[in-house]
From Swiss-Prot:
Domain of life: Bacteria
Assigned keywords, A-Z: Fimbrium, Signal
Pfam families membership: Fimbrial (PF00419), MrkDrd (PF22003)
Biological processes, Gene Ontology terms: cell adhesion involved in single-species biofilm formation
Cell location: Fimbrium
Protein name in UniProt: Fimbria adhesin protein
Entry-linked PROSITE patterns: PROKAR_LIPOPROTEIN
Amino acid sequence: MKKLTLFIGLMALGTTSAWASCWQSNSAYEINMAMGRVVVSPDLPVGSVIATKTWTMPDNNTIYVTCDRNTTLKSDAKVVAAGLVQGANKVYSTAIPGIGLRFSRKGAISMIYPDSYTTTGSSFRLVGSTFTLDIIKTSTTTGSGTLASGPYTEYGPGFTILKTSLNADAITIVSPSCTILGGKNMNVDIGTIKRADLKGVGTWAGGTPFDIKLECSGGVSVSGYANINTSFSGTLATNTSANQGVLLNEKTGNSAAKGVGVQVIKDNTPLEFNKKHNIGTLQSQETRYITLPLHARFYQYAPTTSTGEVESHLVFNLTYD
């Protein structure tokens, strides 16, 4: 009986001596994932990354967890934010409609939260790794507002060594939209001129004014805004540059006029193509009606002209920032 008792005691002692002791050497590194104002383009496909930001861990070789011998530990990457719901491809939906978040780390082991892996060592660091936040468009219609503040993720080998959070107003989502009144396609009849009205390359004649009318909704939070920008493009007329605003005659066949295109004018100046033009700013939950007045006229771009029809296409693009 005494031998049996002694044997059990020795076995227990041997088991205890095999255990490693690990402790947290330094407090967790913390990241405030501030990205400021993030504007969502209405034309962005569902599943696209709206915005992304990567943080590099400090290159100071800080040891966050220490063990008294080589030890195998399980490292967990967890999402701890309240109210987030995991969806497909580890994208978490937020309280803002159509807006999702994806969290990831890259280093010796790359992972998308939530995830885990085992690693062996006596000291555990963050140096050489990065943390990335992707903001994802999860539905066709997106809302606006500020992402909730508080803790979002935790990572570490048995002890938390990396934390991420958002402060108040750290990320504001802006989902503006503009509707072109009258539809996306517009036909402008610029009338008729005589061939003799054009006096040579670089001269113009005739023409008519036309308006592009927009109804724009800010769809932003109290602290948000959105700039509305437009750009114009088309096939440039021969021997002209983008700042002359002259479109090639795309009419073909025997009925097409030769050497004559269409010049577009804005504010009494040729409209520069492929350039961003700011046409307004939307404030909090504001709806604005914007009219963009333009003028189209005939323009001679070649030394030789002929009578006939002129047909050109102008492409109008809207962007937000």
